[in-house]
């Protein structure tokens, strides 16, 4: 390489070439390996970008916002999934064991994984619910593809046919969408083997409107007669 560079009139000594290759390799080890481990061990990986996470050491306020938003969104989503399965949603979502799988340099990467349930938390017959929850968590990036410029597109019904799970997913994405106030302008969300989604203040506006005024397909009017057995005023 040094000889080829000399023919082109470039001053490239073997030592300078080795130094450059070593620097590139060290940068790859510093940034690539931690991220690769995150992608392999996490159910969901967040990548935040913005002025608050540009430095080598991200702002603590930005990190705290991301970790709190992730926990709140996933616990709320888990409560909806448990509720759909007729389980004690309040108890199980509160006891949900969410693990921080690690962080990686390059703006701010943060990985989250759902730990297996313990025997005292859930019986064996209900363990499939956790797999449904893990699937719902990993599908969050896929759902972002249905967020259009001004509205959530009808394709969301193909991704999430169940209306209740669809609403829960949109609420989770709304909670994850950056406000821009903590130095985070965009948040990429990815999961193993699935497409990466992106959330920003624009998606936040669209999601807020979709959650506030859901687009109900096949609307019908009718009168219902029955007895109200239970009402959850917290939802």
What are these regions (language model features)?
Residues 1-201:
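Protein-protein interaction interfaces in oligomeric scaffolds
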Residues 32-34, 195, 212-216, 226:
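Short, flexible coil/linker segments at or flanking structured domains
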Residues 181-183, 231-234:
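A short, compositionally biased
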Residues 201-221:
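Short boundary/loop segments of OB/S1/cold-shock single-stranded nucleic-acid-binding domains
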Residues 218-233:
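Structural detector for short beta-strands of small beta-barrel domains
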């Amino acid at each position: 390489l040094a000889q080829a560079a000399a023919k082109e009139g470039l001053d490239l000594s073997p030592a300078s070439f080795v130094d450059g290759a070593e620097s590139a390799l060290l940068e790859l080890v510093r940034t690539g390996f931690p991220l690769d481990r995150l992608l392999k061990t996490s159910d969901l990986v967040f990548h935040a970008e913005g002025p608050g996470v540009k430095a080598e050491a991200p702002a603590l306020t930005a990190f705290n916002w991301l970790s709190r938003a992730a926990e709140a969104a996933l616990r709320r989503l888990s409560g909806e999934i448990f509720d759909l399965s007729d389980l004690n949603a309040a108890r199980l979502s509160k006891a949900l064991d969410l693990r921080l799988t690690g962080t990686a340099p390059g703006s701010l990467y943060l990985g989250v994984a759902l730990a297996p349930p313990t025997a005292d938390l859930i019986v064996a017959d209900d363990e499939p619910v956790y797999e449904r929850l893990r699937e719902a968590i990993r599908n969050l990036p896929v759902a972002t593809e249905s967020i259009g410029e001004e509205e959530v597109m009808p394709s969301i019904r193909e991704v999430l046919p169940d209306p209740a799970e669809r609403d829960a997913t949109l609420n989770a994405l709304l909670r994850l969408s950056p406000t821009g106030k903590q130095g985070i302008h965009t948040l990429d969300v990815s999961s193993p083997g699935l497409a990466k989604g992106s959330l920003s203040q624009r998606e936040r506006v669209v999601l807020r409107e979709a959650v506030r005024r859901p687009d109900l397909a096949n609307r019908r009017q009718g009168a219902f007669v029955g007895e109200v057995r239970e009402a959850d005023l917290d939802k």
